[in-house]
């Protein structure tokens, strides 16, 4: 069921109504810092935020449409009590088709990988809005353990633990370059 939902959303996101594809990235207008950020992105981020067009998209949407739990900390200031179990929470709810309930536990805490198109103009970041700036989000993905030392993951089950995720080892200059690249994905 959620594959069909993802496909419907993907079709909408590929439409010209949503994607003008007029960004500096699309026009090939990157300065040296942004180009460095693009290289870093290709190494550390493109596995989930694909730089290749998916299916029939005319340009890259910077998402694979998959679901992961990246271990975001709880946002106690969002006014929503309790944990947000994401896809697993929905599949375990009375609103979900009964056929999917048995796989719900494996999906706890998972959220769809968002497109990064226009990401610079869509704060706050994270499914729960825990990070106010793009830089804070990148710093979390660079070293999530540092954030967890203060505020652990909201849903500790099923955390995505691909080698390097949350421990990229980027320095401030690299983080600034990556953020600069992400800003080039904004339509003009």
Where in the sequence are the language-model features?
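Post-cleavage N-terminal segment of exported redox proteins
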Residues: 1-39, 47-59, 160-188
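Short glycine/threonine-rich turn/loop motifs
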Residues: 25-132, 136-140, 147-152
